[in-house]
Amino acid sequence: MKPQNLHFDYGLVEAILVPFIRNEIRKFGFGSVVLGLSGGIDSAVVCELAVRALGVENVLALMMPYKTSSQESLDHAELMVDRLGIRYEIMPVTEVVDAFFATRPDASRLRRGNVMARSRMLCLYDVSARDGCLVLGTSNKTELMLGYGTMFGDMASAVNPIGDLYKTQIFGLARHLGIPAPLIDKPPSADLWEGQSDEADLGFSYEEVDQLLYMMLEERMDRDAILAEGIDSAFYQRVRSMVVRNQYKRMMPVIAKLSSRTPGIDFRYARDWQEVR
């Protein structure tokens, strides 16, 4: 597959996502948002879009470092705060995470990373309740398809404007929006431990997997057609298995249908009951 198939008109993407954020937030009766600002490119893009949609006064960024978080991540988050002039709060999660694992000293890195992500979710949703705002999500399409994230952690949000953009496309949108170069140029990382990087964890690059996912999803190509494009068979099978295995992460909890109107199945339009004022 030719790489340009992943390219978008990013001016058009901005023109769609800015009113999307504004409309989705306001239709539920809210006017402001809170999001985790990690110093990475995904949260930077979402923060930029949110300010353009809602105004600087209606966006609150939380920085939630753990003791092993890199100083560079904090510096890059502050770079976005200074660029946009938004309000921010620093809420370290070290004490919460360490207290949880005080009686679980043999916990794996994966378990620790999940608890870090869910501790940050707690902070975001507590601020959401405190301030009467909605949590804005920062998970991209690549992460969602691969299940590369923590359910009820970094994947938790009320509205996710970038969930249909592959990581490769996030980079393109970031350049269009004028996100500072240091955030774009550094290797993507969840910063869960020192030296951690997304692509090292996954075992392949975002460019490689995005092109494969594009063939599988957008082009709906079958295995034989994909392998004919030169994709390695083992790579194809691994990615396909990740997509299938992590379907549950992309869904709300499945409800057994017993009545004529079931939440999430037949009953989906509560906003039709809202009074028009």
UniProtKB/Swiss-Prot annotation:
SUPFAM superfamilies: Adenine nucleotide alpha hydrolases-like. Deamido-NAD(+) binds at residue 118. InterPro entries: NAD/GMP_synthase, NAD_synthase, NH(3)-dep_NAD(+)_synth, Rossmann-like_a/b/a_fold. It catalyses: deamido-NAD(+) + NH4(+) + ATP = AMP + diphosphate + NAD(+) + H(+). GO terms for cellular component: cytoplasm. One of its GO terms (biological process) is NAD biosynthetic process. ATP binds at residues 36-43, 138, 167, 189. It is an enzyme of class 6 (ligase). It holds the Pfam family NAD_synthase. GO terms for molecular function: ATP binding; glutaminase activity; metal ion binding; NAD+ synthase (glutamine-hydrolyzing) activity; NAD+ synthase activity. Mg(2+) binds at residues 42, 143. Keywords: ATP-binding, Ligase, Magnesium, Metal-binding, NAD, Nucleotide-binding. Its EC number is 6.3.1.5. HAMAP family: NadE_ammonia_dep (MF_00193). Catalyzes the ATP-dependent amidation of deamido-NAD to form NAD. Uses ammonia as a nitrogen source. NCBIfam families: nadE, PRK13980.1. This is NH(3)-dependent NAD(+) synthetase. It comes from Chlorobaculum tepidum (strain ATCC 49652 / DSM 12025 / NBRC 103806 / TLS) (Chlorobium tepidum).
